């Protein structure tokens, strides 16, 4: 199991990044959340098997078709098992 905290920079708001990330994470069987930040970045926490988390990170580097990802800050965290689904949260 693996858990990551990710900050995605670039043109990632207003391009369906959150919805697309949530869909991809759910397809991969991951739990966690994604939300927009006031500074224009997207923040997400994902938890699940390591291979699926790595697949989501690879997707995050590209994002949906209209996104232009310029940076990805990834930090591994302790697995907690606190989530039951992957959710899109309200903006901060």
UniProtKB/Swiss-Prot annotation:
Superkingdom of this protein's organism: Bacteria
One Gene Ontology molecular-function label: acylphosphatase activity
Keyword S-adenosyl-L-methionine tagged: no
Annotated keywords: Hydrolase
Catalysed reaction equations from the record: an acyl phosphate + H2O = a carboxylate + phosphate + H(+)
Broad enzyme group: hydrolase
EC number: 3.6.1.7
Residue stretches making up the Acylphosphatase-like domain: 3-90
Pfam families in the cross-refs: Acylphosphatase
Key word Isomerase present: no
Positions of the catalytic residues: 18, 36
PANTHER family noted in UniProt: ACYLPHOSPHATASE (PTHR47268:SF4)
Similarity comment: family membership: Belongs to the acylphosphatase family.
Protein name per Swiss-Prot or TrEMBL: Acylphosphatase
UniProt source species: Methylococcus capsulatus (strain ATCC 33009 / NCIMB 11132 / Bath)
Gene: acyP
């Amino acid at each position: 199991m693996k858990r990551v905290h990710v900050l995605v920079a670039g043109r990632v708001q207003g391009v369906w990044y959150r919805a697309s990330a949530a869909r991809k994470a759910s397809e991969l069987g991951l739990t966690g959340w994604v939300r927009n930040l006031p500074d224009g970045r997207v923040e997400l926490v994902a938890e699940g098997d390591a291979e699926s988390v790595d697949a989501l990170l690879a997707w995050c580097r590209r994002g949906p078709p209209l996104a232009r990802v310029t940076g990805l800050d990834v930090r591994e965290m302790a697995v907690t098992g606190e989530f039951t689904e992957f959710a899109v949260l309200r903006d901060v």
